Amino acid sequence: MPGPDASLPDLVLRRLAISEQVAAAKFGAGRPVDDPVREQRELARVRVLAREIGLDPDLAAGFLSDQIAASKQVQHRLFTHWSAHPGDLPEGGPDLSVLRAELDGLTVALLDRLAATGSEALEPPESPDELQEPLRTAFRTLTRQRPAPGGSGNGP
């Protein structure tokens, strides 16, 4: 679980990094990426949590909706890759319920951090240069140990 000093971008990256494991669990179980019932339930839960901590429920739900959309993009890309290259699917897929519990904990941490930093944390940076390191970190997170298309799956 993230520490109390984890930054908002760090928490977003941690949540996004779990997307690959979620995709593997869903793909291995024959479940679709999209789960609109769970998504709506999570957005409703976030609205309640936001009210409890004094955060605008619409801001919180919009923020989580963006996190869900980013995760689904990663999952769809992996589903496409694994459909074409089934040998690249990680063996022994993770338990989706365990991953969802981890995501739920990250959601609470994200909301707490968002409430602590305020909505200005969601404002675009003044300079594109401010995005360089977070983007490099996100790229490394999403490509770490990822096989090249048609690769063996034995990344560095």
Task: State where each predicted segment sits.
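Acidic helix-start/capping segments at beta-turn-to-alpha-helix junctions
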Residues: 36-46, 63-71
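Acidic/histidine-rich alpha-helical segments that form the ligand environment
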Residues: 90-118
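Glycine-rich, aromatic-bearing surface loops/beta-hairpins
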Residues: 114-156
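A structural signal for well-ordered alpha-helices, especially hydrophobic packing surfaces
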Residues: 19, 50, 71, 75, ...
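Secondary-structure edge/capping motif, primarily at the C-terminal ends of alpha-helices
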Residues: 25-30, 78, 85, 117, ...
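Mid-length scaffold segments of soluble, non-membrane domains
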Residues: 53-82
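Second-shell loop/turn segments in exported
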Residues: 5-8, 28-36, 48-53, 89, ...
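Immediate post-signal-peptide N-terminus of mature secreted/exported proteins
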Residues: 1-32
